[in-house]
Amino acid sequence: TSQPLNFSTVYFGGGSPALCDLAPLKDVLSSLIPHPSSLIPYEFTVELHPLDVTEAKLRELEDLGVNRISMGVQSLDDDILADMQRGYTFADAEAAFQMVKRYFDNAGIDLIVGYPGETTALTPRHARLAKWGLRHCSVYSLQNERGLKNVPDDETVMNRLDITARFLAELGLQRYEISNYAIPGYECRHNLAVWRGEDYIGLGEGACGRMGLKRTVGRKTGVEESEVTPEFDLKERAFFRLRTREGLDTTALQSLPSYPFLRATLDRNVVAGLLERDGLVYRLTERGMEVCDAILAELA
């Protein structure tokens, strides 16, 4: 585009981004954001693998302007971490996060729920985790891409997610999106912008972007571009909000020919106890949080 772009967030993730040479990234950032500290609000997140964490790397990230760290811990169980082939123990992750906190107050972790052999009850390691000073936690259900055996059923996974949610609530982390919890004020601004329907640019293989009606996906051969209809764009941006505690405001959808169907579908989920309605705004209930994808599929 020939028009200047204003950025308020940067998210450097996917794989283990901190393993790469940061010099090219500095060049890209300096061309996009000459003065990052002048952007309000400004959030620059980098995802870290626990084994990537060193004093030198953290200082380098700090000098780059990073002010938020997300560390992929995945599990508190050493046997599960070994089966995941993560290459570290819970104690290693704990030490890495303590080092991160010396440089970055705004730091959180990712966890995966539903792995075979996972205990339902809280363990002494949860008590240790409570002392980490977490500002944010993303909790995802296992996607069984490896074809693991003895994967727990959906009801068991939902029970474990509920236990995890209550544990995080005791630490002051509130659920603000179906998979994300934060101390108030530490919500991920970058992801919130996406869920609120704002435009964003994705750089790199597999990264998606949205600018107006244009959609992009990074491929090995370059950037694949497509264009959606105004109706699709309006619905997509609105439906993303359903993932959050803010909920789906249907005001802008009333002009669509499909609005009666959308309204009937939403109201049916209210009766089912999966949504709650406040005027023209629909929000997921706790039960609805666990089946959000199914509700969105109904609306598509």
Please name every model-derived segment.
Residues 1, 5-33, 40-259:
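C-terminal scaffold of the Radical SAM
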Residues 235, 239, 263-267, 296:
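Generic detector of well-ordered alpha-helical segments enriched in charged/polar residues
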Residues 243-247, 271, 297-300:
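Generic surface-pattern signal
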Residues 256-271:
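Short amphipathic alpha-helical interaction segments
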Residues 281-285:
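Minor-groove-contacting beta-hairpin "wing" of winged helix-turn-helix DNA-binding domains
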